[in-house]
Every structure is written in structure tokens, then in C-alpha cells.
Amino acid sequence: MALGCVAAMAAHASIQYNVRGTEYQADTLFHAMLGPGTSQTSLLMRSAEGRQMYVYYAKIDLTNPYISFSTVMGQDSFAGTETVRSMSERKSRPGARYFLGVNGDFYYTSGTTRRGDSRVGIPIGPCVVDGEIYKANTNTDFTQFVLDANKQNPIIGCTKFSGLATNASGKTCGVDGVNLVNPSGGNRLIIYNKHFFPYTDTPAGAAEIAMKLADGESFVFGKPFKMVATAAPSTAGDMDIPADGFVVYGLGASADFVKSLKEGDEITVEFHAHIDGKEVFPHTMMSSWPNSLHNGEVTDTEYLLEEFGSNQPVTAVAIADEGKTIMFLTIDGRSPISSGARTTEIADLLRLLGATDAVNMDSGGSSTFYSSS
């Protein structure tokens, strides 16, 4: 993929925006094409009452063949921290330049594993990176931005995850998720892969078994795949995850399903993800909260969290032009020159700029808008 910067043009046009009942004069401080199908605009918005906001947004044309999207993990690890700029510079390579990005999911800010590794940076919600499943589960508190492998059908909504494992005798067991931290309670079957820690970080007492994909199979959504046991089950807990394989963990009645397997046994697994009743096939998935704009209507989100109803730095990802355009937008805040905004205000501004659906990313001090010419 070749990405280049088209000649920039400074602009000083002024326009009026009515955001949640307040009139703002918006002066365009900067407008440029950053790369194929991608523009960036910077606005200074001022109200008659003296409120001022610096706004940075980008519009990305999904139909442009030279553009692709990726979720990027800090240090390419399940747990780890890294700035958006550092991620972009580190991931760029000849033929593929990461030139635009915003912060994403809420994440763990404390804690260590049983072996002493930091949990800081673990995503709270489901996450898929270039088709690789880093985390999957049904999380009704979080909203996902999802894009398929063809850069088509972008969707924002709450993902309902379902999974099923079937052994050779036809016995089935529901799969609760992938790479879940501290599983507890009830009957749970969880699959751990190479993107987790090198071990499952689970307590003793449940059942675990190391497995690998059968030849020619892929660990993906929407298509059944076969896995083969490579060892006998164990109840010791905290099992090492094979570099080229998986660990299947069973708790409660699901432990019996795991214990019934022996080395060489095969199971068939399938994962499905649905948003608003529609099956999705995530190649890129990022979680956050809240879903602030839905079908062109600003949603009531300020009551959900105190910070949502106060002026804060905010970042959002949005869909426009019937799914042909993705928007990134950040409003600076906690500054003498930029007040920040409420969740309903960033949603209303995105609506005025043409978006129909939006999700707020982790905002406040995490809000970041990075671009490189």
C-alpha cells in the first residue's frame, strides 16, 4: 500500500454551527489532504458567551484502494502501553505508512498476573487486529467499531458474541470468549491464544488442555474450524500457551467437556458475532463507550458517567456517507484555550459534519489525534 501527502492548502473560511442549542463561529485553521482519500481539518469554534474549542477531524474515503485500517495494540502485546504517534511510526514500513490515528479502547490501568507481569494496557472490550482475535466476549457495556476485511460494511454497535465447541461424539459446550482475564463463576469455556500472555494466568481447579489448529484451519469468526489436542488435560492452572497453539479452559460443568478430551482428540469450534441482529465478520474491531450517535440521532449519554456530562477532551470515531466514509474527531480540553466538550456535543458536531453513527473512544487525558504529512 502506497501512501503519500498531497500538497496542503491553508484555509480561513468561517461557518456557523449550532451545537446543542449554542451558536458557534467556526474558523478553519487548517485543511489538507494527508494521503489518498484522506483529509484533515482543524477548526477554532467560539461562542458569543466566550466558550472556545479546538477541533481536529479527518474524513477517510473507504472506497480508496490505497487506504486500509488497523487496530494497533501497544507494543503489539495483549498488555502494554505506547503513544499513538509511537505506534504509527513503529508500524510504518516501505509500502505501508501509518499516517493517521486516534486513541482507542478503555484499558486496564493497574494489576499484575500470577507470574508478576503487568496487566496495564489490556483492552477492556473485544478487540480484533487485522483479522487476529485478541479478545472476544459479549460485553453489553461497551460499543464496537467493526470493519470487515474488504473495508466494507462498517458498523458501530454492541457486539453479541456466541461460540460453540463440539467433540467427536457430538457433545457440545458453549464458548464464552477468547483471552478473558480472571474467568470466574458458572460454567465457562474460554480459549486462550498466542496474543494473550504466554500462559493462561488461571487458578488451579478448573481444567485446561493444550491444542492446535488442524491442518488448513483458521481461527476466525463465522467459519467452523477444527482443533486437535496436543496433550492430556490438567487441573494445575496457569498453563503455558504453546507458541503455535492454544489452551482451552473449562470451569464448572465446562471442565467436564475439557476433561473428556485426550491427546489427539479433535473438536470443532465456531464463533459468531452479531450487532443489531446482523452477523458481522470483524477484521478490525475496537471497543469503547458510549454509542453517542445512532442513525443520525444524538443519544442521551451524559447521565451514564459524570465526565460525559462535563467539558472534557473527547475523541470519537464515526461513520458517514452510508458507510463510505470514516471520521476521526478530537476536541482538545482541560486547557485555557480549549474547553473540551460533553459527549452529546461531540456527537452533535459529528452529525453536523455528516456522520450518522459514532462511538466515543476513551477520552479525557487519553484523547489523541495524530497525523503525519
Label the predicted regions:
Residues 201, 217, 253, 284-285:
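Short, functionally important structural connectors and interaction interfaces within domains
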Residues 1, 91-93, 318, 351:
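N-terminal cationic-hydrophobic initiation segments that often serve targeting/anchoring roles
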Residues 225-277:
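Beta-propeller domains
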Residues 1-16:
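Bacterial Sec-dependent N-terminal signal peptides
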Residues 12-246:
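Zymogen propeptides
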Residues 254-373:
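Extended C-terminal subregions enriched in glycine
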Residues 71-77, 250-254, 332-336:
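Second-shell loop/turn segments in exported
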